[in-house]
């Protein structure tokens, strides 16, 4: 990872942490994502494509870690203009960690930090329309559907796919079982 990580938070969740990658972890995480059938379907099977997430100047990447090691990644991009104080979020978990509530809990933890500590008033996320499991998880956290962006993102098959635009305002984060 070529970007500095000193500014990134370490956030403690229930059974997991969100933290910056440690030296040597990025290559292992990229390999895990690109070889995982579920994660690679959404994040890509090409290691160079996934590695770009870790190298983008405006994207901050945290690992979702358990005692067993990295379970996935969660990213955020901040808009720091005081008139548009918002952030975009994305998350990708390895297939053996999906369906256990970890993704929703990680999103909830990061959302609260972005609202309470970073002062954002709005968060956005933009899953593929076809990624119904992710959409349900985001709604459980408090994200609301606001529209569809047609042919928004090129998929692994080389064609453009629609994405669902979702947002959440400060004060709308839902606790477990509320969504």
PLM regions with names:
Residues 100-113, 136-140:
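Conserved acetyl-CoA-binding loop-helix of GNAT-fold acetyltransferases
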Residues 1-52, 171-179:
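A short, well-structured alpha-helix characteristic of acyl/acetyltransferase catalytic modules
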Residues 124-127, 144-161:
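Conserved catalytic-core motifs of GNAT/GCN5-like acyltransferases
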Residues 103, 107, 131-134, 151-156:
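Short glycine/proline-centered loop/turn elements that form peptide/ligand docking sites
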Residues 40-98, 113, 169-173:
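Acetyl-CoA-dependent GNAT
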Residues 16, 69-73, 161:
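Glycine-rich phosphate/pyrophosphate-binding loop shared by adenosine-nucleotide-utilizing enzymes
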Residues 138, 143, 166:
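Conserved active-site tyrosine of GNAT-family acetyltransferases
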Residues 116-126:
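Conserved GNAT acetyl-CoA-binding A-motif
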């Amino acid at each position: 990872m070529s970007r500095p990580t000193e500014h990134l938070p370490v956030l403690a969740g229930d059974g997991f942490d969100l933290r910056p990658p440690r030296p040597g972890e990025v290559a292992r995480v990229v390999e895990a994502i690109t070889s995982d059938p579920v994660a690679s379907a959404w994040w890509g099977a090409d290691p160079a494509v996934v590695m770009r997430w870790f190298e983008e100047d405006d994207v901050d990447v945290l690992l979702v870690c358990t005692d067993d090691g990295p379970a996935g990644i969660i990213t955020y991009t901040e808009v720091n203009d005081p008139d548009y104080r918002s952030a975009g979020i994305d998350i990708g978990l390895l297939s053996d960690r999906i369906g256990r509530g970890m993704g929703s809990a990680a999103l909830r933890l990061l959302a609260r930090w972005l609202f309470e500590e970073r002062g954002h008033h709005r968060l956005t996320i933009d899953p593929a329309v076809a990624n119904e499991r992710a959409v349900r998880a985001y709604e459980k956290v408090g994200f609301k559907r606001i529209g569809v962006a047609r042919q928004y993102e090129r998929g692994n098959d080389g064609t453009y796919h629609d994405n669902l635009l979702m947002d959440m305002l400060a004060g709308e984060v839902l606790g477990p079982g509320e969504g």
